[in-house]
Every structure is written in structure tokens, then in C-alpha cells.
């Protein structure tokens, strides 16, 4: 699929930052920012459009509350929803964000039925599954952003501890986007060299815990807002892989249909991202301990899915 038009639903901090990344990196020709609150998307779009001469991009940016403008979108990125507050988990916002995603998907199905859909709204694992079940589309077309961000956070922490270039660090995080995520140390390297060659286990464990709580750390420090620059950069990285059909292996929230021994659940797993969306899931060999941790992450998501079923 040639990505020409992208819609971002939700013109909050993540949505606006994502729009900036996309146009500055020339990842679309037309971008629509949509928000339920009148004036928010329009103002953000106008601000971004006026930076075009300074950043030298030609994309046309439009803000609106009208879903009719999303017609012919190749990709819809959903960032809308109630944000977390200090002390809240990602699951705590499920009740508020479930009807928001349902309404958005109804409009996407009506006005952009040919599009790919990327879910960013938390809890992203549960809401990705809900969006997929609600629309009934092929799983390649509905996926979530989480693992790219979590892996980037882990890589940045590793760079800080080792003093080495983050460009040479390859980190891999599986599982849910939260406390049960599974940073895979065996698959984390620096220029192909295992991480354990550079750091002892105590430091690695500290990095793992900091990665698991990376979003909360920012929320605790800022108080009034959660992370938005790094999530937006992660979204842009995924869009780049799709737009340019790069066939990159990135950790994405994908619908599992037998992979890793699981069905009917959305989880963060290594996936091939290309022009057709999430084209393939890569199954990594896991140790017995890693399998147990992965299963624990699945069970945590299934708990939220059971709550969703009762909603």
C-alpha cells in the first residue's frame, strides 16, 4: 500500500507530536488531525502547517471534528482517549477509553474502510483486540504501537549505563504494554554482542524495572501529562516501515492466532511491518522462564479482556 493520506484521531499531545514527526519526515502527502473538541485539531493543524516553510515539507495538514474528512485515508492512527494520571495504571482507563475506540472504529469503518489502523490509546493491548474484533478486518490491518516505544526506552537506558552509542543497541521487548512486559535480554545486543558482555545482572535488572515503569516515571515527574515525544517517534518509525515497505522486524501489538501458543489475544511480539501493514509475526524461541513470563503477561491482558466482555 502506498501511504499518501494519514489521519490521526486525537489531537492531544501524542497526536500533535505525531503529526509533526510525520510531516517533517515526509511520511505522507496529506494529513488530517481529528478531535472531538472543536478548535483543538484545527489550531494544531494550522500551527503545524505554518512551520512548513521552516521545515521544508509540502504535506497538507487539515484539522477538523468531521469524520467525513478521513475518507481515502491509507492509515488511521488512533491516539484519542482519557490519559493516565499519577497513580493510575494503563488498565485503569479501560472503561473510559473503550466507548471512545468503539465510536472511532465505527467511523473508520464507514468513511475509510480500506485503511490500516494503528491503535495507540491505552490499554493498547486490549483496545487493539477490541478494535480488531469490532471491525472484523484481517489482522494485518489492525495493530498497536507499544513495543517499539518500550524497546527504545530500554535501549536509551542501556546507552546511559554503558556510555555507548544508542545507534548500536538493539533491544527487544515482548508482552503487554505495562508492568508485565517482557524485556528479552538474550535478544538484546550492542553491535551484535550480547548485553551481558557489557553489564552485570544487577544493572540489567535495574534497566528492566526502569523500562517497565518508563511511562510512569515521566508521568510522575511531569504530573500533568504523560510521555508524548517518544511515543510519537515510535509511531513515526512504524509509519516509515509501512510507507516505504521496508519489511522491518519491530515489536508490535498483534492479534495472535496460534503464535506463541496463544489465540484470541493481542500481544507485543516481533512482527514484519511493510506496505500491507503487519505482514507476519516472528516467533522467537523462548526459554522455559521466558515462556512463563510471557504467559503471565497474556493472563494479565486476558483479565482486562474479560472485563471488556462484561462491559
Swiss-Prot record:
Which residues are the active-site ones?
177
Record flagged with keyword RNA-binding: no
On whether Oxidoreductase is a keyword of this UniProt record, the answer is yes
Q: Which Gene3D superfamilies match?
A: Lactate dehydrogenase/glycoside hydrolase, family 4, C-terminal (3.90.110.10), NAD(P)-binding Rossmann-like Domain (3.40.50.720)
Q: What is its EC number?
A: 1.1.1.37
Domain of life according to the entry: Bacteria
Q: Which GO terms describe its biological process?
A: lactate metabolic process; tricarboxylic acid cycle
Name the chemical reaction catalysed here. (S)-malate + NAD(+) = oxaloacetate + NADH + H(+)
In which residues is substrate bound? 84, 90, 122, 153
Keyword list, A-Z: NAD, Oxidoreductase, Tricarboxylic acid cycle
The residues that the entry says bind NAD(+) are 10-15, 35, 97, 120-122
GO MF term (any one): L-malate dehydrogenase (NAD+) activity
Record function comment: Catalyzes the reversible oxidation of malate to oxaloacetate.
Family, according to the entry, reads as follows: Belongs to the LDH/MDH superfamily. MDH type 3 family.
The name this protein carries in UniProt is Malate dehydrogenase
Write down the species: Nitrosococcus oceani (strain ATCC 19707 / BCRC 17464 / JCM 30415 / NCIMB 11848 / C-107)
Q: What is the lineage of its organism?
A: Bacteria, Pseudomonadati, Pseudomonadota, Gammaproteobacteria, Chromatiales
